[in-house]
Amino acid sequence: MEMKDFIFTSESVSEGHPDKVADQVSDAILDAILTQDPKSRVACETLVTTGMTVVAGEITTNAIVDYPKIVRETIKEIGYNDSAMGFDWETCAVLTSIDKQSPDIAQGVTEGEGLFKEQGAGDQGLMFGYACNETPELMPMSILLSHKLVKKLADVRKSGVLDFLRPDSKSQVSIQYINDRPVHVDTVVISSQHTPEVSYETIKEGIIEEVVKKIIPEELMDAKTRFLINPTGRFVIGGPMGDCGLTGRKIIVDSYGGHGAHGGGAFSGKDPSKVDRSAAYMGRYVAKNLVAAGLCEKCEVQVAYAIGVAEPVSVMVDTSGTGKIPSARIAQIVREVFDLRPRAIIEQLDLLRPIYKKTAAYGHFGRELPEFTWERTDKVSIIREKAGI
Protein backbone atom coordinates (compact mmCIF):
# COMPACT_ATOMS: atom_id res chain seq x y z
CA MET A 1 0.00 0.00 0.00
CA GLU A 2 1.29 3.47 -0.91
CA MET A 3 2.48 5.53 2.05
CA LYS A 4 0.49 8.72 2.57
CA ASP A 5 2.80 11.64 3.31
CA PHE A 6 1.33 15.15 3.32
CA ILE A 7 1.31 18.48 5.17
CA PHE A 8 -1.96 19.86 6.55
CA THR A 9 -2.38 23.42 7.82
CA SER A 10 -4.87 24.98 10.24
CA GLU A 11 -5.12 28.50 11.64
CA SER A 12 -6.60 30.24 14.67
CA VAL A 13 -7.08 33.84 15.75
CA SER A 14 -6.94 35.49 19.16
CA GLU A 15 -9.72 37.07 21.21
CA GLY A 16 -8.50 40.47 19.93
CA HIS A 17 -8.94 39.65 16.25
CA PRO A 18 -11.74 41.91 14.92
CA ASP A 19 -13.99 39.02 13.87
CA LYS A 20 -13.51 37.39 17.28
CA VAL A 21 -14.26 40.67 19.07
CA ALA A 22 -17.57 40.64 17.19
CA ASP A 23 -18.23 36.99 18.10
CA GLN A 24 -17.55 37.65 21.79
CA VAL A 25 -19.81 40.72 21.88
CA SER A 26 -22.63 38.73 20.25
CA ASP A 27 -22.23 35.86 22.72
CA ALA A 28 -21.86 38.18 25.73
CA ILE A 29 -25.23 39.70 24.79
CA LEU A 30 -26.71 36.20 24.35
CA ASP A 31 -25.44 35.20 27.81
CA ALA A 32 -26.86 38.32 29.45
CA ILE A 33 -30.26 37.61 27.91
CA LEU A 34 -30.29 33.89 28.76
CA THR A 35 -29.34 34.71 32.36
CA GLN A 36 -32.66 36.53 32.76
CA ASP A 37 -34.86 34.65 30.28
CA PRO A 38 -33.65 31.19 29.15
CA LYS A 39 -36.51 30.86 26.64
CA SER A 40 -35.38 33.91 24.66
CA ARG A 41 -34.91 33.80 20.91
CA VAL A 42 -31.66 35.51 19.98
CA ALA A 43 -29.95 36.20 16.66
CA CYS A 44 -27.38 38.88 17.44
CA GLU A 45 -24.89 40.19 14.88
CA THR A 46 -22.02 42.57 15.64
CA LEU A 47 -19.78 44.77 13.49
CA VAL A 48 -16.66 46.43 14.87
CA THR A 49 -14.60 49.04 13.06
CA THR A 50 -12.47 52.09 13.91
CA GLY A 51 -14.07 53.72 16.95
CA MET A 52 -17.43 52.01 16.51
CA THR A 53 -19.45 48.91 17.39
CA VAL A 54 -22.79 48.14 15.72
CA VAL A 55 -25.12 45.51 17.23
CA ALA A 56 -28.14 44.37 15.20
CA GLY A 57 -30.43 41.38 15.02
CA GLU A 58 -33.71 39.77 15.94
CA ILE A 59 -34.26 39.23 19.67
CA THR A 60 -37.48 38.19 21.40
CA THR A 61 -37.08 38.25 25.18
CA ASN A 62 -38.45 39.40 28.51
CA ALA A 63 -34.92 40.29 29.62
CA ILE A 64 -33.91 43.91 30.15
CA VAL A 65 -30.36 44.30 28.91
CA ASP A 66 -27.96 47.26 28.79
CA TYR A 67 -26.40 46.59 25.37
CA PRO A 68 -23.76 49.36 25.41
CA LYS A 69 -22.56 48.29 28.87
CA ILE A 70 -22.12 44.66 27.75
CA VAL A 71 -20.29 45.78 24.60
CA ARG A 72 -17.88 47.97 26.55
CA GLU A 73 -17.21 45.38 29.26
CA THR A 74 -16.40 42.76 26.61
CA ILE A 75 -14.02 45.07 24.74
CA LYS A 76 -12.32 46.01 28.02
CA GLU A 77 -11.78 42.36 29.00
CA ILE A 78 -10.20 41.63 25.61
CA GLY A 79 -7.70 44.44 26.16
CA TYR A 80 -8.64 47.35 23.91
CA ASN A 81 -8.04 49.98 26.58
CA ASP A 82 -6.12 52.72 24.76
CA SER A 83 -7.51 55.11 22.13
CA ALA A 84 -4.09 54.99 20.41
CA MET A 85 -5.17 51.55 19.12
CA GLY A 86 -8.00 53.24 17.17
CA PHE A 87 -10.57 51.28 19.17
CA ASP A 88 -11.10 51.22 22.91
CA TRP A 89 -13.87 50.36 25.35
CA GLU A 90 -14.35 53.84 26.79
CA THR A 91 -14.55 55.98 23.66
CA CYS A 92 -15.99 53.71 20.94
CA ALA A 93 -19.51 54.52 19.75
CA VAL A 94 -22.10 51.78 20.30
CA LEU A 95 -25.05 51.67 17.89
CA THR A 96 -27.92 49.18 18.24
CA SER A 97 -30.73 48.08 15.93
CA ILE A 98 -32.72 45.24 17.50
CA ASP A 99 -36.00 43.81 16.14
CA LYS A 100 -38.07 40.81 17.26
CA GLN A 101 -37.98 37.32 15.77
CA SER A 102 -40.29 36.87 12.78
CA PRO A 103 -43.60 35.31 13.92
CA ASP A 104 -43.42 33.00 10.88
CA ILE A 105 -40.19 31.50 12.23
CA ALA A 106 -41.40 31.59 15.85
CA GLN A 107 -44.39 29.33 15.18
CA GLY A 108 -42.06 26.63 13.82
CA VAL A 109 -39.80 26.58 16.88
CA THR A 110 -42.46 27.01 19.57
CA GLU A 111 -44.07 23.80 20.84
CA GLY A 112 -47.77 23.52 20.02
CA GLU A 113 -47.63 25.96 17.11
CA GLY A 114 -46.97 25.50 13.39
CA LEU A 115 -47.73 22.44 11.25
CA PHE A 116 -45.77 20.14 13.59
CA LYS A 117 -46.51 20.36 17.30
CA GLU A 118 -43.02 19.48 18.58
CA GLN A 119 -40.31 22.13 18.81
CA GLY A 120 -38.93 22.17 15.29
CA ALA A 121 -35.57 23.24 13.93
CA GLY A 122 -35.08 27.01 13.74
CA ASP A 123 -34.01 26.72 10.11
CA GLN A 124 -33.17 24.22 7.42
CA GLY A 125 -29.52 23.31 7.05
CA LEU A 126 -26.75 20.78 7.44
CA MET A 127 -24.33 20.55 10.35
CA PHE A 128 -21.20 18.47 10.89
CA GLY A 129 -19.44 17.01 13.90
CA TYR A 130 -15.91 15.63 13.82
CA ALA A 131 -13.47 13.77 16.06
CA CYS A 132 -10.21 11.86 15.59
CA ASN A 133 -7.78 10.07 17.88
CA GLU A 134 -4.61 11.99 17.03
CA THR A 135 -4.72 14.01 20.29
CA PRO A 136 -6.05 13.24 23.82
CA GLU A 137 -8.80 15.82 23.20
CA LEU A 138 -9.85 13.82 20.11
CA MET A 139 -9.24 16.87 17.92
CA PRO A 140 -7.00 17.40 14.88
CA MET A 141 -3.56 18.42 16.09
CA SER A 142 -3.13 21.32 13.65
CA ILE A 143 -6.16 23.28 14.93
CA LEU A 144 -5.54 22.33 18.57
CA LEU A 145 -1.98 23.71 18.51
CA SER A 146 -3.13 26.81 16.61
CA HIS A 147 -5.69 27.55 19.35
CA LYS A 148 -3.18 26.97 22.13
CA LEU A 149 -0.66 29.35 20.53
CA VAL A 150 -3.04 32.32 20.35
CA LYS A 151 -4.35 31.57 23.85
CA LYS A 152 -0.77 31.61 25.12
CA LEU A 153 -0.18 34.91 23.30
CA ALA A 154 -3.12 36.40 25.20
CA ASP A 155 -1.86 34.97 28.49
CA VAL A 156 1.66 36.42 28.17
CA ARG A 157 0.19 39.76 27.03
CA LYS A 158 -2.20 40.06 29.96
CA SER A 159 0.32 38.82 32.54
CA GLY A 160 2.97 41.29 31.34
CA VAL A 161 5.52 38.65 30.33
CA LEU A 162 5.48 40.15 26.82
CA ASP A 163 4.07 43.57 27.63
CA PHE A 164 4.70 44.92 24.13
CA LEU A 165 1.97 42.72 22.62
CA ARG A 166 -1.46 44.08 21.70
CA PRO A 167 -4.71 42.08 21.47
CA ASP A 168 -4.90 41.23 17.74
CA SER A 169 -3.04 38.09 16.68
CA LYS A 170 -3.19 35.01 14.45
CA SER A 171 -1.49 31.63 14.38
CA GLN A 172 -1.05 28.94 11.75
CA VAL A 173 0.43 25.47 12.15
CA SER A 174 1.47 23.14 9.31
CA ILE A 175 1.87 19.52 10.33
CA GLN A 176 3.38 16.63 8.40
CA TYR A 177 1.21 13.52 8.45
CA ILE A 178 2.45 10.06 7.50
CA ASN A 179 -0.29 7.48 7.03
CA ASP A 180 -2.76 9.91 8.65
CA ARG A 181 -0.71 10.28 11.86
CA PRO A 182 0.91 13.63 12.84
CA VAL A 183 4.69 13.20 13.01
CA HIS A 184 6.31 16.62 12.61
CA VAL A 185 5.56 20.34 12.85
CA ASP A 186 6.75 21.77 9.54
CA THR A 187 5.91 25.47 9.91
CA VAL A 188 4.57 27.78 12.63
CA VAL A 189 3.28 31.20 11.61
CA ILE A 190 2.42 33.81 14.24
CA SER A 191 1.42 37.41 13.58
CA SER A 192 0.84 39.54 16.66
CA GLN A 193 0.02 43.21 16.99
CA HIS A 194 2.56 45.13 19.08
CA THR A 195 3.48 48.56 20.40
CA PRO A 196 5.27 50.87 17.92
CA GLU A 197 8.62 51.19 19.69
CA VAL A 198 9.58 47.51 20.15
CA SER A 199 12.20 46.00 17.83
CA TYR A 200 11.46 43.11 15.48
CA GLU A 201 14.20 41.01 17.12
CA THR A 202 12.60 41.44 20.56
CA ILE A 203 9.19 40.42 19.22
CA LYS A 204 10.52 37.35 17.42
CA GLU A 205 12.67 36.11 20.29
CA GLY A 206 9.93 36.73 22.86
CA ILE A 207 7.24 34.90 20.89
CA ILE A 208 9.45 31.91 20.05
CA GLU A 209 10.70 31.49 23.62
CA GLU A 210 7.57 32.37 25.63
CA VAL A 211 4.87 31.09 23.29
CA VAL A 212 5.99 28.64 20.59
CA LYS A 213 8.41 26.58 22.68
CA LYS A 214 5.94 26.47 25.57
CA ILE A 215 3.13 25.08 23.39
CA ILE A 216 4.58 22.97 20.54
CA PRO A 217 5.82 19.58 21.85
CA GLU A 218 9.59 19.39 21.57
CA GLU A 219 9.48 15.96 19.95
CA LEU A 220 7.47 17.37 17.02
CA MET A 221 10.08 20.02 16.16
CA ASP A 222 13.58 19.79 14.71
CA ALA A 223 16.08 21.96 12.86
CA LYS A 224 13.86 21.89 9.76
CA THR A 225 10.85 23.42 11.55
CA ARG A 226 10.27 26.97 10.31
CA PHE A 227 9.14 29.81 12.56
CA LEU A 228 7.61 32.74 10.69
CA ILE A 229 6.97 35.46 13.30
CA ASN A 230 5.32 38.68 12.09
CA PRO A 231 6.59 37.96 8.57
CA THR A 232 5.68 41.44 7.23
CA GLY A 233 8.12 42.88 9.79
CA ARG A 234 5.62 45.22 11.49
CA PHE A 235 2.09 44.88 12.94
CA VAL A 236 1.20 48.06 14.87
CA ILE A 237 -2.13 48.93 13.26
CA GLY A 238 -4.51 46.09 14.08
CA GLY A 239 -7.78 45.12 15.67
CA PRO A 240 -10.95 46.85 14.46
CA MET A 241 -8.83 49.81 13.28
CA GLY A 242 -6.90 47.55 10.92
CA ASP A 243 -9.84 45.46 9.71
CA CYS A 244 -13.60 45.59 10.09
CA GLY A 245 -14.80 42.64 12.19
CA LEU A 246 -18.06 40.74 11.83
CA THR A 247 -19.81 37.99 13.77
CA GLY A 248 -19.58 34.57 12.12
CA ARG A 249 -16.55 35.18 9.89
CA LYS A 250 -14.31 32.55 11.51
CA ILE A 251 -16.38 29.38 11.16
CA ILE A 252 -13.42 27.11 10.33
CA VAL A 253 -11.39 28.46 13.26
CA ASP A 254 -14.48 27.82 15.42
CA SER A 255 -14.77 24.20 14.30
CA TYR A 256 -12.03 21.83 13.07
CA GLY A 257 -9.49 23.93 11.19
CA GLY A 258 -10.31 22.55 7.76
CA HIS A 259 -10.53 18.90 8.82
CA GLY A 260 -13.90 17.45 7.90
CA ALA A 261 -16.72 19.37 6.26
CA HIS A 262 -18.68 22.45 7.36
CA GLY A 263 -22.35 23.20 6.77
CA GLY A 264 -21.75 26.95 6.52
CA GLY A 265 -23.67 28.16 9.56
CA ALA A 266 -21.93 30.26 12.21
CA PHE A 267 -22.36 29.79 15.96
CA SER A 268 -21.99 33.04 17.87
CA GLY A 269 -24.96 35.23 18.76
CA LYS A 270 -27.46 32.39 18.28
CA ASP A 271 -29.61 30.83 21.00
CA PRO A 272 -29.75 27.00 20.95
CA SER A 273 -33.08 26.84 19.09
CA LYS A 274 -30.86 27.60 16.08
CA VAL A 275 -29.60 24.22 14.90
CA ASP A 276 -26.59 25.90 13.26
CA ARG A 277 -25.23 25.98 16.78
CA SER A 278 -26.95 23.29 18.85
CA ALA A 279 -26.81 20.55 16.20
CA ALA A 280 -23.14 21.28 15.47
CA TYR A 281 -22.43 20.87 19.18
CA MET A 282 -24.44 17.65 19.15
CA GLY A 283 -22.51 16.46 16.10
CA ARG A 284 -19.26 16.91 18.01
CA TYR A 285 -20.74 15.05 21.01
CA VAL A 286 -21.76 12.13 18.79
CA ALA A 287 -18.48 11.95 16.86
CA LYS A 288 -16.34 12.24 19.99
CA ASN A 289 -18.20 9.45 21.76
CA LEU A 290 -17.92 7.17 18.71
CA VAL A 291 -14.14 7.68 18.55
CA ALA A 292 -13.76 7.42 22.34
CA ALA A 293 -15.69 4.13 22.23
CA GLY A 294 -13.15 2.74 19.78
CA LEU A 295 -15.59 2.26 16.91
CA CYS A 296 -13.31 4.27 14.61
CA GLU A 297 -10.12 6.34 14.54
CA LYS A 298 -11.78 9.34 12.95
CA CYS A 299 -15.42 10.18 12.47
CA GLU A 300 -17.50 12.77 10.67
CA VAL A 301 -21.21 13.05 11.43
CA GLN A 302 -23.65 15.00 9.27
CA VAL A 303 -27.15 15.88 10.44
CA ALA A 304 -29.67 17.91 8.42
CA TYR A 305 -32.98 19.58 9.29
CA ALA A 306 -36.05 21.22 7.77
CA ILE A 307 -37.37 24.39 9.40
CA GLY A 308 -40.18 23.69 11.84
CA VAL A 309 -39.61 19.91 11.80
CA ALA A 310 -38.15 18.17 14.86
CA GLU A 311 -36.73 14.94 13.42
CA PRO A 312 -33.61 15.39 11.26
CA VAL A 313 -34.17 14.70 7.58
CA SER A 314 -30.88 12.79 7.42
CA VAL A 315 -28.06 11.43 9.58
CA MET A 316 -24.78 10.28 8.02
CA VAL A 317 -21.61 8.84 9.56
CA ASP A 318 -18.28 8.64 7.68
CA THR A 319 -15.28 6.96 9.31
CA SER A 320 -12.89 7.29 6.34
CA GLY A 321 -12.41 3.53 6.35
CA THR A 322 -11.32 3.39 10.00
CA GLY A 323 -14.54 1.88 11.38
CA LYS A 324 -14.52 -1.48 13.18
CA ILE A 325 -18.10 -2.03 12.02
CA PRO A 326 -19.85 -0.76 8.86
CA SER A 327 -20.69 2.96 8.76
CA ALA A 328 -24.37 2.18 8.13
CA ARG A 329 -24.48 0.23 11.40
CA ILE A 330 -22.72 3.08 13.23
CA ALA A 331 -25.33 5.51 11.88
CA GLN A 332 -28.05 3.18 13.16
CA ILE A 333 -26.41 3.14 16.61
CA VAL A 334 -26.31 6.95 16.56
CA ARG A 335 -30.07 7.04 15.96
CA GLU A 336 -30.62 4.58 18.82
CA VAL A 337 -28.35 6.27 21.38
CA PHE A 338 -28.71 9.97 20.60
CA ASP A 339 -31.98 11.94 20.33
CA LEU A 340 -31.29 14.49 17.59
CA ARG A 341 -34.49 16.53 17.88
CA PRO A 342 -33.78 20.19 18.76
CA ARG A 343 -35.53 20.16 22.15
CA ALA A 344 -33.80 16.90 23.10
CA ILE A 345 -30.39 18.32 22.10
CA ILE A 346 -31.01 21.39 24.26
CA GLU A 347 -31.99 19.21 27.22
CA GLN A 348 -29.19 16.63 26.83
CA LEU A 349 -26.46 19.26 26.54
CA ASP A 350 -28.12 21.71 28.96
CA LEU A 351 -27.84 24.56 26.47
CA LEU A 352 -30.26 27.11 27.96
CA ARG A 353 -27.48 28.52 30.13
CA PRO A 354 -25.22 31.59 29.82
CA ILE A 355 -22.19 29.58 28.65
CA TYR A 356 -21.56 30.99 25.21
CA LYS A 357 -19.08 33.85 25.64
CA LYS A 358 -16.46 31.26 26.69
CA THR A 359 -16.96 29.44 23.39
CA ALA A 360 -16.43 32.55 21.26
CA ALA A 361 -12.61 32.51 21.28
CA TYR A 362 -10.06 29.65 21.07
CA GLY A 363 -12.45 27.07 19.64
CA HIS A 364 -15.89 25.69 20.42
CA PHE A 365 -14.50 22.14 20.41
CA GLY A 366 -11.63 20.31 22.08
CA ARG A 367 -11.66 22.31 25.33
CA GLU A 368 -12.85 20.17 28.21
CA LEU A 369 -14.39 22.90 30.35
CA PRO A 370 -17.31 22.13 32.70
CA GLU A 371 -19.68 24.22 30.57
CA PHE A 372 -18.76 22.40 27.36
CA THR A 373 -21.13 19.46 27.84
CA TRP A 374 -20.66 18.34 24.22
CA GLU A 375 -17.08 17.33 25.12
CA ARG A 376 -18.24 14.62 27.55
CA THR A 377 -17.69 10.97 26.62
CA ASP A 378 -20.48 9.53 28.75
CA LYS A 379 -22.07 7.44 25.98
CA VAL A 380 -19.05 5.19 25.42
CA SER A 381 -20.37 2.17 27.35
CA ILE A 382 -23.76 2.01 25.64
CA ILE A 383 -22.17 2.55 22.22
CA ARG A 384 -19.71 -0.31 22.76
CA GLU A 385 -22.52 -2.53 24.03
CA LYS A 386 -24.66 -1.91 20.96
CA ALA A 387 -21.67 -2.36 18.64
CA GLY A 388 -20.68 -5.62 20.32
CA ILE A 389 -17.05 -4.64 20.86
From Swiss-Prot:
Q: What class of enzyme is it?
A: transferase
Record text on cofactor binding: Binds 2 divalent ions per subunit. Binds 1 potassium ion per subunit.
Q: Which GO terms describe its biological process?
A: one-carbon metabolic process; S-adenosylmethionine biosynthetic process
One Gene Ontology cellular component term attached to this UniProt record is:
cytoplasm
Q: Does the keyword ATP-binding apply?
A: yes
User: Which residues does K(+) bind?
Assistant: 45
Q: Where does this protein hold ATP? A: 17, 168-170, 234-235, 243, 249-250, 266, 270
- Alphabetical list of PROSITE patterns matching this protein: ADOMET_SYNTHASE_1 (PS00376), ADOMET_SYNTHASE_2 (PS00377)
* Names of the cofactor(s): Mg(2+); K(+)
Query: Whom does it interact with, and what assembly results?
Result: Homotetramer; dimer of dimers.
Q: What is this protein called?
A: S-adenosylmethionine synthase
